[in-house]
Amino acid sequence: MTAGKSLLRWASGIMIVLGAGHLLLLALFAWSDITGWVDRGVWAAVPLGLTAEEETVASAQNAATFWAGPGSFAVPLILLGCLTWHLARRGVAVPAWVGWSLAAWCVVGGVLLVPSPYFAGTVAGALVVLAARQGDRSAAQRERAMDPA
């Protein structure tokens, strides 16, 4: 599983860099909105908007900052990258469906938002799939070696 570990570590590194980079860029470009949340007391700083009030440019920008940051998939992508790294270190195979799902999500995102780093996420998904396939092959080879019939 050494090659599989290497593939999974590369995949997890890509996921962590994509998620952290996304949050870092948001912090750089929307710092005033983020500090505004703290100034307003954080609780319900981004209202759900179920009222009859008309949406202003400022409230739309506030909501966009939320959905581009903590409400985006950046945090779950970082967590998935950390989990993948942890599982690779322990020698536990990550299922191929995780890689296929990540790759499909990133292809759709990349097609909808061009140019974007979504396609790097497709590479991470492909690496997870390759690692799972290598793990399946090595398990089959071990079974054949144990069954001399």
Predicted segments with their positions:
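Short, intrinsically disordered terminal tails adjacent to the first/last structured region
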Residues: 1, 139-149
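Membrane-water interface of alpha-helical transmembrane segments
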Residues: 2-12, 60-63, 67, 92-99
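Juxtamembrane non-transmembrane "cap" segments at the membrane-aqueous interface
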Residues: 33-45
